[in-house]
Structures are given as C-alpha cells and as structure tokens.
Amino acid sequence: MENLAWSPFKSLTAEQREQIDRFREQLLRFNQRVNLISPETEDTFRTRHLLHCLTLTARDFPAGCTVVDWGTGGGLPAIPLAICHPEATVVGVDSVGKKSRAVRTIARRLGLDNCFTWNGRADEWTGEAHYSVSRATAPLADLWAWHRRVAVSPDDPNGDAWPPGLLALKGGDLSDEVAALHAADPDARVERHSLNDLLGRNGFFGEKEIVAVRS
C-alpha cells in the first residue's frame, strides 16, 4: 500500500485506522454466517474491498451531507465512508434483511453514530440524499433514477467536494451502460475517473473507475 501514487490510508487518524481494522474483523466474522463478501476475497480484503471503496474519498463529502449506498451488502462502501467522514450521514440500503442487520450491528459495534441501514428495495426508500454511491449493484441508468428520486442539493458544497450526484464504482466496458443512461436522461453529465490513474497501479484496478453522474 505504501507505493500507491495516492493513498487514502495516509490521511486516516489513529482512531479511524483502528475502526477500519475492527471493521475488517467484524465483517469476516459475520461472513462465516452471512454471505457479505465472497469467501475467496477474504485474504485480499484490504485491496479488493477496502481500498476500492476508499477511492471515493479522493474528494471530500461536505459536513452535514447525507450519502445513500444502494445495495450496501457488507457495508461497502457505507461503513468505510462513515468512518472517514464522521460529519456526514451514511445510509446503507439493501433488500436482504440479514445483510442489513449484520451491517447495523457492525456499525453499532464500531461506534458509528452516523451510519444507518434500511432494509428494502432501493426504489422504495423514502429518505433524501445529497449523494448516492454504489459498488457492483445495478446499471448506471437504474442508479441514476434512484438518485434523482431522492436527491437534494447541499447547502454549501466546498470546492474540494464531489459535485452532488451519483458516484458509482464500476469496471469493464461501460459504453452500453453510459448510452442507456443518456437515453433515459440526455441531460445527465458523466465524468469517469480511472482508479489506475488515481492509485498508480495495475492488476485489480486496471479497468476500474469512479463514474460520477450529476444533473
């Protein structure tokens, strides 16, 4: 991790590092009973899951904002974001009850008062959010439709923050997804940020990117 061009770990406080380590321990413990992540990826959790999610912290989330994580699964990226942004509210939405309950318990054990879960379909959540995030959950057009339904603008986003909207962790050929998104909403603005460029490494992150969508 020390050879990364940019590393989210360097800016973490000692308390946040401890919370990250405890999150890994708790998630792997729950994973023995609930399928939160693939067992084959447990040994590479720090890279394949944690670092992947923390690339979203390359830019800021304003204090007081609400972030909704569609299909949070094992709390990825909801819990890492809640750890790194204690002044933001993070809501993990998942339709699988046992996953939602596991994430709720993990967040409570980590002392994350800013992290919540909601069990149900994404298109039925009735809250409001300034940002939506997602990791391997649904096509961009669906994610954007879910975000637009609940979107509100931050009061005063700072210049270092992500523009309000959708931030999706994606990989592979996205041409069809982007085309479908623009067919559904021709005015949607899409920015694509290569994780390989951000992190300065090949391998797992070679074709992965953050897709930022905003109005």
UniProtKB/Swiss-Prot annotation:
Its EC number is 2.1.1.-. It comes from Salinibacter ruber (strain DSM 13855 / M31). The gene is rsmG. This is Ribosomal RNA small subunit methyltransferase G. It is found in: Cytoplasm. Specifically methylates the N7 position of a guanine in 16S rRNA. Belongs to the methyltransferase superfamily. RNA methyltransferase RsmG family. GO terms for cellular component: cytosol. The lineage of its organism: Bacteria, Pseudomonadati, Rhodothermota, Rhodothermia, Rhodothermales. Pfam families: GidB. The keyword Cytoplasm applies. InterPro entries: rRNA_ssu_MeTfrase_G, SAM-dependent_MTases_sf.
